[in-house]
Amino acid sequence: MKGRAHIWVALLLACLPPRFRNLDKDVSSPVCRTDDVYTGDAFYPFKKKKYVLYDVHIGEGFNLQKEVLYRVALAVYYLNQEERTHVHYLVLPPWCYVTHWGRERTNARIKWSIFFNLKALQNVIPVMEYAEYEGQFGPHTDYILSYRHIIGEWPKRGDKKSFQVLKLDKCQVKGYKLKKNLRKNCDHKYSVEYSGKCTNVKGKKMECLEFFFITSHFVSSTLLDIFQYDADSVLIKHGSNILVAFMNELVDANLEDVLPYSEDLINEGDQFVEKNFKSSKNYISCHLRYTDFRKISTYDVSPVGISLLKLLYIMFLRKSTLIFVSTDEKKEVKKVIDSQFPQFKHFFFFYENEKLHTGQVAIVDQWICARSGTFVGNIFSRFSMHIKWERSLIGKGGPDHNLDLCGYSISTNHELRKKYSDVQDAHLDEEALQKLRPLYMRLSQKDRDFLRTICYDFAHYYPQNVSIYRRGERREEGRLM
């Protein structure tokens, strides 16, 4: 009996985190996996695990899918705070098909760790990639759940239920199937397409919940109810239906700053800056979005030529000789540079790497933009927004170093002007203008007005604290004009 007791004590000590073991060295344990430890809970190894899977609407962009992670992660955080007898895992959906990856449809099921450093997120909530989950449980879950916002007036009824439970097809879940003519002992009767048609996930039960405000807190409360019964895993279909969290919610949960880029991709961007800019901080970066934005009249995208001329003006204004361009139309932009600005061609730089995945190239682009002295983006673009988010986290979030190119009709379109926090119709700087004089003289009045107008995004959309996970330095910021 004593021998068994000693074995139990040995196992207990092996599983406890280092601060409980009082050991000088963190000896790897044969019992507890070091990559499977929830650092926020000392007694994690002894708790039963529950799993929250999710996905988004098929084809959603890379940066929107990144945003949805924060919403679901916040729900899982609330779960672990509310219910401490179990530990709840966030299962990250694989990347299979993303709209902006074009024809690069793949069944490779790319992991999040290819793009991001997950250690920061794992400090807040337990996280695992879907590949690991599938390895343990197969493509199965106990519950398939989706949410739908109530549109219109809440129906009058005698009872006071907080939400309505509907059939899953009422949530417009595509690829949903109910298997018929099954054997009696078949548990997983329901099947849905999962994560950009990566695979099909089968579930035992399914529900669609309808409510006014699908917040992360509401989601956590419904998950808590489900997990209290005989359920160990839930798949949330269309996690993008969850409302965006308030910044203070993310800050309070330590989730404001949990998706740093992969170290490999950061190093790739750093090497590009070192090679081309000699590590100069005074380069201009920009994001020019054209492909689909041209079709949306309210975005009022300016022509490539006048956009590039405005970037040159800002470059000369900032006493720089370097412009890094991130764009979804590199060939078109390069063509315009060659034809309209051959004398300034040596000022423009692009990042290209055929060995990397499209998503990886996009992140390297974002990091190079994040490091720049001044960034010029598009307030309607999530790609630009995530660059500004990253810049805020490395101490470059000041408004005068994060500009918007402005809509093309900004000087006359009053509704468009309301979409910016500030619009300045400034006088042109003569010294900077002198270097562009021949080109400026050929401009129409509309183009001249566009050139001198400076637009600003809303700073309160972005983090106000410098990250402990990201590398960067604060810098003194002055007015642009």
Swiss-Prot record:
Q: Where is the active site?
A: 60
Q: Which residues form the signal peptide?
A: 1-22
Q: Where does GDP-beta-L-fucose bind?
A: 59-63, 287-289, 365, 382-383
| EC number(s) reported in the record | 2.4.1.221
Q: What does this protein do?
A: Catalyzes the reaction that attaches fucose through an O-glycosidic linkage to a conserved serine or threonine residue in the consensus sequence C1-X-X-S/T-C2 of thrombospondin type I repeats (TSRs) where C1 and C2 are the first and second cysteines of the repeat, respectively. O-fucosylates sporozoite proteins CSP and TRAP. O-fucosylation regulates stability and intracellular trafficking of TRAP but not of CSP.
Question: So what family is this one in?
Answer: Belongs to the glycosyltransferase 68 family.
Name assigned to this protein: GDP-fucose protein O-fucosyltransferase 2
Q: What is the lineage of its organism?
A: Eukaryota, Sar, Alveolata, Apicomplexa, Aconoidasida
Query: Gene symbol?
Result: POFUT2
